[in-house]
A protein has these predicted regions:
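Short acidic, hydrophobic short linear motifs in intrinsically disordered regions
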Residues: 20-29
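Amphipathic alpha-helical dimerization/coiled-coil segments
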Residues: 76-109
């Protein structure tokens, strides 16, 4: 599963949110990126096609209704899927051991 840099940035917004979000809320959250609404619309549809984002309902937005979205997988699940695609299955136990060792040597936050 490959996400573009922009798609990853959109997903970071969703992973950090504690609620489903409409496109307009995503647009207002990324004011520094200066994405156009149409670009975000395309990215949201692409993220749904890739299975990392799902439509969960509708919310009133002005005189119309807007779809709301939430992650279809957690950030950790996404990273696991990316690693699983890149790493041969026989090396996964070694990766898990390295992660456990890293956790043991990293101070808790």
């Amino acid at each position: 599963m490959h996400l573009t840099k922009s798609e990853q940035q959109i997903m970071e917004i969703f992973w950090q949110a504690d609620h489903a979000m409409a496109q307009t809320e995503v647009v207002s959250t990324c004011v520094e990126r200066k994405w156009k609404e149409r670009s975000i619309f395309s990215m949201l549809n692409s993220l749904m096609e890739k299975g990392v984002l799902r439509e969960v309902g509708f919310v009133r937005s002005g005189k119309t209704y807007a779809r709301t979205f939430e992650p279809a997988m957690s950030h950790a699940e996404y990273l696991a899927a990316v690693v699983a695609e890149q790493l041969p299955a026989k090396q996964l136990p070694e990766l898990l051991a390295a992660l456990m060792q890293k956790m043991e040597t990293t101070p808790a936050i």
